[in-house]
């Protein structure tokens, strides 16, 4: 791996991780579909490259996982049959935009979609990743 090239590429992407407590568990599939579509539309309208956007909307009986790995057409939503004591939303995103703008977009879309059921932001972190510094590294290409 050329770590200089890798670091240059990674530095273009804002990273975001957020968790939200959801107050009422209702219309989860509708909410997840809207959240996924809205994020895809926003990123496409700003012509932003999406590395990935993932979210889990977890209810007491089932969860919904949304993914975008490029343009909005790549968006997928699937159900999980796992139960939870808590009702929450977890968002993980890597998008070619400054982290502050990524936070702004995600916060606006969370508010737009989840305000009808109520939510509370628990954690929200965004950053530009630092240069990788692997513990073990080959000095030359290893041929297998």
Stretches found by the model and what they are:
Residues 2-144:
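P-loop NTP-binding site
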């Amino acid at each position: 791996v050329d770590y200089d090239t890798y670091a240059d590429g990674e530095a273009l992407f804002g990273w975001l991780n957020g968790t939200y407590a959801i107050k009422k568990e209702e219309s989860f599939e509708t909410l997840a579909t809207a959240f996924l579509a809205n994020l895809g539309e926003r990123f496409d309208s700003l012509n932003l490259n999406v590395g990935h956007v993932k979210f889990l909307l977890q209810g007491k009986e089932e969860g919904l996982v949304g993914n975008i790995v490029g343009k909005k057409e790549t968006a997928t939503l699937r159900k999980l049959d796992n139960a939870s004591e808590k009702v929450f939303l977890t968002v993980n995103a890597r998008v070619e935009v400054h982290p502050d703008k990524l936070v702004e977009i995600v916060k606006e879309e969370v508010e737009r979609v989840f305000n009808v059921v109520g939510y509370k932001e628990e954690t929200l972190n965004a950053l530009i990743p630092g240069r990788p510094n692997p513990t073990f590294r080959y000095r030359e290409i290893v041929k297998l």
